[in-house]
Regions:
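Anionic-ligand binding patches
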Residues: 2-5, 12-183
Length: 183
């Protein structure tokens, strides 16, 4: 396998995935490219579209979202836009008075081998609840309002929990298993 490169403009995502790769003594390159945010119905569509723009080296991209049950899965694939527009405060405003606070983070990683070939998709998910207020300064995005199932603190309060159970880590683990078996 040639050098594997993560294509993202998001330094926080890169840092999170690189940490996981470091745990497995694997080198991970970073191609810092700002990809246009495709408005699609699924994370998989966004990832496949992003990968269609790259050839020549082993690359992967990742897209993620938070899907809130009481809001019909919103913001879902529009998570970045919604976060940039209204932030956590806007989500919490929408959730005022809502008892069902169930939510899930989903991440989809798409891998494209050097020289083309079929794109392989790997999905990770973590279930939990939306907190009543933002808690913690750690992480990024929706981390301060997401409490993973089985824990009492948000990802923003305890980044060590996120590093153990995050949706992104679960997708990256599947990518790593694939790479070990196939390349």
């Amino acid at each position: 396998m040639s050098k594997l490169s993560f294509i993202t403009s998001n330094q926080d995502k890169y840092r999170e995935v690189k940490s996981f790769f470091n745990e497995h003594s694997l080198e991970l390159g970073w191609t810092r490219v700002s990809l246009p945010e495709l408005q699609a119905d699924t994370l998989e569509e966004v990832v496949e579209h992003s990968l269609s723009q790259f050839n020549g080296e082993d690359v992967f991209v990742e897209d993620a979202g938070v899907f809130i049950d009481a809001l019909g899965g919103f913001p879902g694939v529009y998570s970045r836009y919604v976060y940039d527009t209204v932030g956590n405060a806007g989500i919490l405003k929408l959730m005022e008075g809502v008892e069902n606070r169930r939510a899930r983070f989903e991440a989809v990683i798409g891998f494209k081998p050097a020289g083309g070939g079929d794109v392989k998709l790997f999905k990770g998910e973590v279930r939990g609840n939306v907190s009543l207020s933002p808690k913690g300064e750690g992480g990024f995005g929706y981390d301060p309002i997401f409490i993973p199932e089985g824990f009492i603190k948000t990802f923003g309060e305890d980044e060590s929990v996120k590093s153990m159970v995050s949706h992104r880590k679960r997708a990256a683990e599947k990518l790593l298993q694939y790479l070990k078996r196939n390349l």
